[in-house]
């Protein structure tokens, strides 16, 4: 039983939630959509709320760092993927991060990038939908109160930054589309379609070194000197960036890429079913990369097919997929940017490791993702 008296993996009834809403996200209609589509359903489900509007970048991060979390049964994030990124990193920056990250989270889509909400919609067995239909589905998930544990990606950069990702890290084509389509934010998710066509017209390649720890080699060795962290979980599979990757890692021989994508969930957008191979096992992420040499026509076909998750059926020799638990990416020429959960970062060496079943989210079922033997882990502690 959790402290609120409800069974493990279920929010209590009645329920108290703090709603963090970005009124400028996506098409700028989040507050209007909350009043029209979310609030009536919450009232019927006996979910009381306090609404807080974010005013600037990292405002939500600052709020959750100091918020008295015991007042709430869950934190509801209504915006795009970037606001959930802020909230999770704010929780992990608290002195009580180990308990703070157990506070259940809920994603209500109202941004231009709604990949996390689309993934949860998919896991619940709903049809792929967008806009108000996706918002309604995710609100219904909140009303049903079921929780599921989620993987968390820990990242370290060459400049010494340590951060956490709830969705993805992209480099190359996808990150450039994120950056260059920012000016079309008012189009909602259509900005990414427009950005894709514009970037295809001037296709770039990016030079770098990619290495990863595949699922099958996790049990073989553990680094003698894992990377040192001041706060947060220990990344036992990572060594300092100035050292070579461990010998049991795979180093990709190619050094010219169109894109690299580490993805924790099924969707990269509400209409981008990027990982049709199924939900990641506990402690695993999807790693995709596209090698240089792919034609514009093939890349366009892949992105169009991704809407229905059929891009892997092309068996494109330039598109590589592997399930991994850790990776390292070292850009060589300074070109391009990183996009972490849709938030842009400078291009520099970065490495990351997945932590299994690390936090709770409102989902369609209480079942954790499938486990695989070498790193089978229990769900996180009971939600607070």
From Swiss-Prot:
Tissue expr: Widely expressed with highest levels in adult liver, kidney, heart and skeletal muscle. Expressed in brain cortex (at protein level).
Residues the record lists as Phosphothreonine modifications: 193
Regulation of catalytic or functional activity: Acetyltransferase activity increases in presence of the kinase substrate, sphingosine. In Purkinje cells, kinase activity on sphingosine increases in presence of VEGFA. In neurons, kinase activity increases during the first 24h in presence of Amyloid-beta protein 42 to decrease after 96h.
Top-level EC class: transferase
Membrane topology: Peripheral membrane protein
Domain of life, per lineage: Eukaryota
Activity-pH dependence: Optimum pH is 7.4.
Keyword terms, alphabetized: ATP-binding, Calmodulin-binding, Cell membrane, Coated pit, Cytoplasm, Endosome, Kinase, Lipid metabolism, Membrane, Nucleotide-binding, Nucleus, Phosphoprotein, Synapse, Transferase
Documented EC number(s): 2.7.1.91, 2.3.1.-
GO annotation, biological process: blood vessel development; brain development; calcium-mediated signaling; cell population proliferation; cellular response to growth factor stimulus; cellular response to hydrogen peroxide; cellular response to vascular endothelial growth factor stimulus; DNA biosynthetic process
GO cellular component, one term: cytoplasm
Functional description taken from the UniProt entry: Catalyzes the phosphorylation of sphingosine to form sphingosine 1-phosphate (SPP), a lipid mediator with both intra- and extracellular functions. Also acts on D-erythro-sphingosine and to a lesser extent sphinganine, but not other lipids, such as D,L-threo-dihydrosphingosine, N,N-dimethylsphingosine, diacylglycerol, ceramide, or phosphatidylinositol. In contrast to proapoptotic SPHK2, has a negative effect on intracellular ceramide levels, enhances cell growth and inhibits apoptosis. Involved in the regulation of inflammatory response and neuroinflammation.
Name this protein carries in UniProt: Sphingosine kinase 1
């Amino acid at each position: 039983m959790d402290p609120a008296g409800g069974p493990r993996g279920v929010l209590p009834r009645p329920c108290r939630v703090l709603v963090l809403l970005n009124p400028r996200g996506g098409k700028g209609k989040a507050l209007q959509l909350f009043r029209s589509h979310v609030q009536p359903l919450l009232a019927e489900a006996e979910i009381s709320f306090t609404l807080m509007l974010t005013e600037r970048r990292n405002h939500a991060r600052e709020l959750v760092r100091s918020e008295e979390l015991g007042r709430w049964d869950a934190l509801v994030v209504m915006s795009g993927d970037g606001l959930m990124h802020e909230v999770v990193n704010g929780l992990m920056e608290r002195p009580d991060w180990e308990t703070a990250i157990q506070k259940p989270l809920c994603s209500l889509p109202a941004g231009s990038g709604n990949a996390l909400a689309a993934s949860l919609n998919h896991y619940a067995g709903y049809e792929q939908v967008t806009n108000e239909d996706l918002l309604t589905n995710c609100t219904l998930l909140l009303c049903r109160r079921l929780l599921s544990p989620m993987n968390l990606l820990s990242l370290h950069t060459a400049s010494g930054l340590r951060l956490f990702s709830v969705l993805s890290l992209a480099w190359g084509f996808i990150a450039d589309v994120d950056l260059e389509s920012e000016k079309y934010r008012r189009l909602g998710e259509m900005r990414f379609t427009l950005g894709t066509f514009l970037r295809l017209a001037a296709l770039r390649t990016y030079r770098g070194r990619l290495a990863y720890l595949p699922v099958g080699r996790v049990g073989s060795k553990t680094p003698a000197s894992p990377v040192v962290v001041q706060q947060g979980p220990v990344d036992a599979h990572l060594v300092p960036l100035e050292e070579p990757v461990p010998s049991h890692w795979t180093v990709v021989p190619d050094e010219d890429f169109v894109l690299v994508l580490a993805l924790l969930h099924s969707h990269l957008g509400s209409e981008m079913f990027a990982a049709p191979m199924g939900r990641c096992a506990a402690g695993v992420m999807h790693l995709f990369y596209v090698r240089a040499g792919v034609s514009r026509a093939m890349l366009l076909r892949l992105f169009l097919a991704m809407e229905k998750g059929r891009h892997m059926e092309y068996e494109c020799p330039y598109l590589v997929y592997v399930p991994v638990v850790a990776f390292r990416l070292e850009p060589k020429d300074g070109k391009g940017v990183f996009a972490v959960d849709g938030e842009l970062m400078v291009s520099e060496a970065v490495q990351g490791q997945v932590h299994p079943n690390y936090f709770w989210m409102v989902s369609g079922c209480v079942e954790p993702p499938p486990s695989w033997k070498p790193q089978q882990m229990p769900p996180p502690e009971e939600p607070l």
